[in-house]
């Protein structure tokens, strides 16, 4: 969610809000100013016309449900354009299509193999080995599909795929 007064993004938890805005620079280092879903140009600069949204790949509505993953974990956060996140025909609280799960896996493995500072956090949250992490993501996807039923994908690819 976005706090208009403070100008930051946050996630609601049973114990309060978690500010996820601070993850933008790290995520953008991988996404290279491209929306995770449609590859349109996005910016992490405040008040920018194309200001990105920090989006939960697996929607935050899964909190408190029969879902194995920590939804607010960095492994589950991506940068998206406004249209993909909550525009007309946007993702909102839907589950991204299965093809996008492979993109999330690839992104997480990039952070791990590049020895990015997020490496240890992603390993702790998703598993020690490539197989464990892939199994974890698939389990999360299967659980989310049962709960959410409907899947979503971007209307069109707007930029050149870069990841």
Predicted feature residues:
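Short, charged surface segments at domain edges that flank catalytic/cofactor-binding sites
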Residues: 1-43, 61-71
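A boundary/linker detector
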Residues: 1-21, 42, 128-163
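Anionic ligand-binding catalytic core segments
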Residues: 2-3, 88-92
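Intrinsically disordered or highly flexible coil/loop and linker segments, enriched in small
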Residues: 33-36, 90, 146
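The −1 position to Zn-ligating cysteines in a subset of zinc-ribbon hairpins
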Residues: 34, 53, 80
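Cys/His-coordinated zinc-binding microdomains
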Residues: 39, 82-85
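Histidine-centered nuclease catalytic patch
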Residues: 39-77, 90-104
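Short Fe-S-cluster ligation motifs
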Residues: 66-82, 109-131
């Amino acid at each position: 969610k976005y706090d208009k007064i403070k100008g930051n993004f946050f996630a609601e938890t049973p114990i309060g809000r978690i500010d996820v805005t601070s993850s933008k620079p790290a995520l953008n280092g991988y996404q290279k100013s491209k929306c995770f879903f449609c590859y349109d140009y996005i910016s992490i600069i405040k008040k920018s016309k194309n200001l990105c949204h920090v989006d939960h790949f697996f929607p935050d509505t899964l909190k408190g449900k029969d879902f194995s993953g920590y939804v607010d974990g960095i492994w589950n956060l991506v940068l998206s354009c406004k249209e993909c996140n909550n525009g007309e025909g946007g993702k909102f609280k839907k589950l991204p299509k299965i093809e996008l799960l492979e993109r999330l896996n690839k992104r997480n493995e990039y952070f791990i193999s590049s020895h990015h500072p997020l490496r240890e956090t992603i390993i702790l949250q998703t598993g020690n080995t490539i197989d464990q992490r892939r199994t974890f993501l698939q389990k999360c996807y299967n659980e989310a599909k049962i709960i959410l039923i409907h899947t979503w994908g971007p209307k069109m690819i707007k930029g050149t795929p870069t990841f």
